[in-house]
């Protein structure tokens, strides 16, 4: 079963109003998809993270020539060569190969992996809380309320991009509006030191209904995380940009995190992503994969999560939630998968089990104009 054709789909969506996190505001969202087709006409889609012009050049210049003629079932021999060059490229190719193999076997993704343990997965609405507007706090709270009205009861909002006092005002106002009807996670995008992160205990202690405190510190600061975890009043989450399964080990061995957040697009392949999830289970941490970038990597995260044993016997079926981007982003509607009541049913059809919106794929195709990464 050889790869005959490789197509690229660089997609670009200009935002009506920039939004962002502690790293700054975004004016656009982008997505790079690939479609591999075998000689027998079996199709597999992949998603790659990165700057569109660079990804397109890499694929046209050497990835497509490298992939043409490769045997899908000999992935173990040649995918590591791609992983050595670029984890981002290899992640996308790995997804496409997985879909092709599942489709050939006549199985859904989860059945290819040995079967589903959870038929639906909870999702939390994820926000980019900042904007250039003076009334950004009110706008942020309105967005959370729109997700609440759509059935979400778990939300993640950003901190660390404004002063502590301003962020505190935002979060307290949000909790008051939610009236304890929803749980909130705070994501600082690695913007604090230990002392500043611990100032949040003041807010955590006088309100409840929290989920976790995400990446308060640079993720390399294992000692800082261990110290913070001993004193913080919320579970500490992190690891969305870690590049290998092994890079979770220092944090896990030191007991530095309560929750790990592997991201398939950073981990160079479907198998290393799934290994990271199981590694977390072996260490007894919770696992809530990071899935901000695109709908296909989110679908893989949902399916992989559905195959995990339960984290706890105490909370329903004990499976942790997955991130669901609830910001303005037309790329989110590219596949036919939407949450209902804060849950997403796992697709049962052959392969990835969802349909692509071909018209939207065409409409969102990047026109090649230059833009700042
Ligand atoms: Mg994060």
Model regions: which residues?
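Structured beta-strand/loop patches that form or line metal/cofactor-binding pockets in enzymes
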Residues: 1-45, 49, 325-332
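Conserved, mostly hydrophobic/aromatic
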Residues: 3, 34, 41, 93, ...
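Metal- or metallocofactor-binding catalytic centers and their adjacent structured scaffolds
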Residues: 36-105
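Hydrophobic faces of well-ordered beta-strands that scaffold small-molecule active sites
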Residues: 46, 123-126, 153-157, 184-188, ...
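Shared catalytic-loop signature of beta/alpha-barrel
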Residues: 65, 202, 208-209, 220-237, ...
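Metal-dependent enolase-superfamily TIM-barrel catalytic cores that perform enediolate-based chemistry
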Residues: 112-232
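C-terminal extensions of enzymes
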Residues: 327-373
């Amino acid at each position: 079963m050889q790869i005959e054709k490789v197509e690229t789909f660089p997609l670009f969506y200009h935002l009506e109003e920039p939004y962002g996190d502690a790293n700054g505001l975004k004016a656009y969202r982008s997505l790079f998809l690939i479609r591999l087709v075998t000689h027998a006409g079996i199709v597999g889609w992949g998603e790659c993270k990165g700057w569109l012009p660079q990804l397109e050049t890499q694929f046209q210049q050497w990835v497509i020539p490298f992939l043409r003629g490769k045997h899908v079932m000999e992935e173990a021999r040649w995918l590591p060569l791609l992983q050595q060059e670029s984890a981002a490229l290899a992640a996308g190719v790995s997804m496409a190969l997985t879909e092709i193999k599942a489709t050939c076997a006549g199985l859904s993704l989860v059945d290819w992996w040995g079967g589903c343990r959870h038929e639906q997965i909870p999702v939390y609405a994820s926000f980019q809380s900042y904007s250039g507007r003076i009334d950004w706090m009110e706008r942020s709270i309105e967005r959370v309320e729109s997700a609440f009205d759509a059935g979400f009861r778990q939300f993640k909002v950003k901190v660390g991009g404004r002063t502590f006092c301003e962020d505190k005002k935002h979060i307290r106002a949000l909790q008051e509006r939610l009236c304890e009807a929803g749980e909130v996670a705070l994501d600082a995008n690695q913007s604090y030191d230990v002392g500043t992160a611990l100032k949040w205990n003041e807010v955590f202690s006088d309100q409840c209904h929290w989920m976790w405190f995400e990446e308060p510190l640079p993720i390399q600061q294992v000692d800082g995380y261990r110290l913070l975890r001993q004193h913080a009043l919320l579970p500490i989450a992190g690891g969305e940009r870690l590049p290998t399964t092994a890079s979770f080990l220092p944090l896990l061995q030191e007991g530095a995190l309560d929750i790990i957040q592997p991201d398939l697009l950073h981990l160079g392949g479907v198998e290393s992503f799934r290994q990271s999830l199981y590694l977390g289970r072996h260490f007894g941490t919770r696992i809530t994969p990071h899935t901000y970038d695109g709908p296909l990597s989110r679908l893989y995260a949902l399916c992989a999560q559905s195959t995990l044993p339960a984290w706890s016997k105490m909370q329903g079926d004990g499976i942790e939630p997955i991130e669901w981007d609830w910001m303005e982003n037309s790329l989110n509607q590219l596949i036919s998968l939407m949450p209902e009541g804060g849950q997403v049913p796992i697709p049962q059809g052959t392969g990835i089990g969802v349909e692509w919106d071909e018209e939207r794929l065409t409409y969102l195709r990047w026109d090649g104009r230059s833009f700042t990464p």
